[in-house]
């Protein structure tokens, strides 16, 4: 990214292929130290990473050391992700993500009876490195792996475990109704009793194969 492009680091990062789920965090939110409490203990090269996010001039030593620059870039991406997880729980962040949700930017539920219900990104852990981002369907209330492989390497901690639930607590009017229909397995037109599979498993577990005689 060259300085002549006049594109902020945040806009550049959110515009990268695979980062479509992110919204652009307001710089004034990032500049408020209260919002970043504790992150300096989680992110290496914290000060340099923060300067990079805010487009502040890097140290001369950093410019002369490309290996160090790569480490700072990685730290900046991690720091932005953790800031993003906090930001999308605020009113401003929710408003930005709600707009993306309404546009279907996060994809649609693959479940047939959810009828193309838009989904929201969610993390299965708030700790970085534990799980990649998943998609939550507010209709069937289940989670799915993103359809596109380019989203399979986005850390779920950058969205957090509570984001979709916070959004619908703030905006209950956007919470969809539960699905009216549910798939019913049938065989020759007849419904399969829910106990059928359980009885089949019990029968299989109690079945003992004959022991061959040793000659």
From Swiss-Prot:
KSSR motif (motif): residue ranges: 147-150
The record describes the protein's role as: Regulatory subunit of casein kinase II/CK2. As part of the kinase complex regulates the basal catalytic activity of the alpha subunit a constitutively active serine/threonine-protein kinase that phosphorylates a large number of substrates containing acidic residues C-terminal to the phosphorylated serine or threonine. Participates in Wnt signaling.
- Pfam families cross-referenced by the UniProt entry: CK_II_beta
Indicate what this protein is called per its UniProt record. Answer: Casein kinase II subunit beta
Q: Where is this region: Interaction with alpha subunit?
A: 188-193
| Assembly notes | Casein kinase II/CK2 is a tetramer composed of two alpha subunits and two beta subunits. The beta subunit dimerization is mediated by zinc ions.
Q: What is the lineage of its organism?
A: Eukaryota, Metazoa, Chordata, Craniata, Vertebrata
Picking any one GO biological process from the record gives:
Wnt signaling pathway
């Amino acid at each position: 990214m060259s300085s002549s492009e006049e594109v902020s680091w945040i806009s550049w990062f959110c515009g990268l292929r695979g980062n479509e789920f992110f919204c652009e965090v307001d710089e004034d939110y990032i500049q408020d130290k209260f919002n970043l409490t504790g992150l300096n203990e989680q992110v290496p090269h914290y000060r340099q990473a923060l300067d990079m996010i805010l487009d502040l001039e890097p140290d001369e030593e950093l410019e002369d050391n490309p290996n160090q620059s790569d480490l700072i870039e990685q730290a900046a991406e991690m720091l932005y992700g953790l800031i993003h997880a906090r930001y999308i729980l605020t009113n401003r962040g929710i408003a930005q993500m709600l707009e993306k949700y309404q546009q279907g930017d996060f994809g649609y539920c693959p479940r047939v009876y959810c009828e193309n219900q838009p989904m929201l990104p969610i993390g299965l852990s708030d700790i970085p490195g534990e799980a990649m981002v998943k998609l939550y369907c507010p209709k069937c209330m289940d989670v799915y792996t993103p359809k596109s492989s380019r989203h399979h390497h986005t850390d779920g901690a950058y969205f957090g475990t509570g984001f979709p639930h916070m959004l619908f607590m703030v905006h209950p009017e956007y919470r969809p109704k539960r699905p009216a229909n549910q798939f019913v397995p049938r065989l020759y037109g007849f419904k399969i009793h829910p106990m059928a599979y359980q009885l089949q498993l019990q029968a299989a577990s109690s079945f003992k194969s004959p022991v061959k005689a040793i000659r």
